[in-house]
């Protein structure tokens, strides 16, 4: 791809596509003006097993109309699983398309911290046994992972985008993919319950849709 054109990957659900997603795409184009942006996206069902607000064809059209070049569908058997399995499939696909950088939103926006929280999980018997200990005490799997990371590194990974970011970086490290992770500061949390900004989370937009409230100020005009 030479020095000029960069192939950038994004992992997403676009459920639905909103101003925060558009902000991310604009930031990528600012940082890498001649980039090709490839998205790995869940289809008609999301990671939580819910039916997507829009079907995959509409989501794809909206993505293309807002600056994405290629949309890949994460197969259903991976896309409605845990963040680790979701990330495994997404990164495998994006690596096959030779992306050089993976860009994702992050609450902490600290790649070094997220990388440390990722690397401590790889081929680490101490980590594995800590996770088992926490699960035997009644914690669920994600909480056990978070507590084990904290015990070994002092890093607290609590926010949804950071959790996904750690999953992505872990896949990159584990598989020795030649992909550089790049974080963009998240302007809002997963559930902020505020209408002060025109960028709110997909979760909040789905809540507004459930209440038949208008979402037009939170999504691009072509959504």
Can you name each region flagged by the protein language model?
Residues 29-30, 64, 91-95:
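Non-catalytic positions within long, well-ordered alpha-helices that form the structural scaffold/packing
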Residues 3-59:
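N-terminal catalytic cores of NTP/NDP-binding nucleotidyl/phosphoryl-transfer enzymes
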Residues 35, 69, 100:
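Short acidic/polar active-site loop segments enriched in Thr and Asp
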